[in-house]
Amino acid sequence: MSERESWHKEIDLFLVAMGYFTRIPMPKWVEVDSDKLNKASRYFGLVGLLVGLLSAIVFWLTQNWLPAGVSVLLAMLVGVLLTGGFHEDGLADTFDGFGGGWTAEDKLRIMKDSRLGSYGALALILALLLKWQLLVELALYDPVVAGSALIVAHTVSRVVSASIIFSEKYVRDDETSKSKPLSQHQGINELLILIASGVLVLLFLKGLAALSLLLVMIGLRRLIIVIFRRQIGGYTGDTLGAAQQIAEIVCYFVLLVVGNIL
């Protein structure tokens, strides 16, 4: 394969990842199949970087003319519109299943139900409120830090979520599941590129903030995996969405705490 063909292949995989995780239209020449979607996992972090960057731009463009709370809300709205609430939906389904089911089978069945339950509604409301409040506090501390936090959190949280695919068992047997192709064998190249995207955005941060966030994310990933194993024996697409949302919120927490210390 020539260098040009290799670059074309990587761009193609990035666009597949973008089409899977966002509502951004893909070019007509991009063809999606299970094999491409499987390999596209390497670029999930970069998709997060794109979503975070666009959200941050909206925040930076509006924060001089609008109250911090409104600018943050607009930035969050952009993120939701870009992804179609994909991860938020996973968070709600996961909490409905984990909160309402007694056995792993019950939990998986509830998670597949499209109706929103009380556990899911509470989780969704609290998650959105936490994100808004934490970002407002970061904006009042320093607007540049708040915008950078959006970029970092959207990227790192997706790296944490996608990395679960590489070590854990996919527990749904449904062949029609959108997440099924992701559950197939993942290569070392996918993992290394995924991790590299997370390391890349840490350059936005000062040394202590970057190190603190890295250590917390490693610990959080381990905790999430332990919970998923105990609840359903592995992961599903919904739980990956929940992992992303939780990791994003924790990112804001860490950056706010470290920012107040520095």
Swiss-Prot record:
GO terms for biological process: cobalamin biosynthetic process. Pfam families: CobS. Keywords: Cell inner membrane, Cell membrane, Cobalamin biosynthesis, Magnesium, Membrane, Transferase, Transmembrane, Transmembrane helix. The keyword Cell inner membrane applies. Its main location: membrane. Belongs to the CobS family. This is Adenosylcobinamide-GDP ribazoletransferase. The lineage of its organism: Bacteria, Pseudomonadati, Pseudomonadota, Gammaproteobacteria, Alteromonadales. The gene is cobS.
